[in-house]
Regions:
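A short, N-terminal "cap"/entry segment at the start of jelly-roll beta-barrel domains
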Residues: 1-34
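A cytosolic small-molecule/anion-sensing beta-strand core signal
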Residues: 29, 57-58, 74-75, 93
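Structural motif
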Residues: 32, 41, 60-62, 86, ...
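Conserved short histidine dyad/triad with adjacent acidic residue
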Residues: 32-48
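Glycine- and acidic-residue-biased ligand/ion/polar-headgroup-sensing regions
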Residues: 40, 49-62, 66-67
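Short acidic-glycine-tyrosine-enriched beta hairpin
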Residues: 67-83
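Ligand-binding loop in jelly-roll beta-barrel domains
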Residues: 83-110
């Protein structure tokens, strides 16, 4: 019989060592759920071949998008950044964000 693991998300989040250093929470098919602390501004980047979903677990973030208005996300809100769209996430206060993305996606941007 296969044991289905229960993941303690808060326990995993406590292992994050510093902002912008995502950790893998779990995998499903070819996708990964990562958690990171956002604080300050990340660099401008894009992902040519993959969409990226941001879900704010705790806090609030902004995602600047080239040529568009800045997206503001509060706790419990999410958005999908389509592949090829240049963006820069950031947060004024430490915020915990879950990212749902293809496991092949480099979490450091391009």
């Amino acid at each position: 019989m296969t044991m289905i693991p229960v993941i303690d998300l808060e326990e995993k989040i406590r292992t994050i060592e510093k902002p912008w250093s995502p950790i893998d929470i779990t995998y499903i098919n070819d996708q990964v759920i990562r958690a990171a602390i956002f604080h300050g501004d990340y660099h401008w980047h894009k992902h040519d071949d993959e969409d990226e979903l941001f879900l704010v677990h705790r806090g609030a973030i902004r995602i600047q998008v080239k040529g568009e208005d800045t997206i503001e996300l509060a706790e419990g809100q999410l958005c999908v950044i389509p592949k090829g769209v240049e963006h820069r996430p950031g947060s004024d206060e430490p915020s915990v964000v879950l990212m749902f993305e293809p496991s092949a996606l480099k979490s450091t941007g391009d």
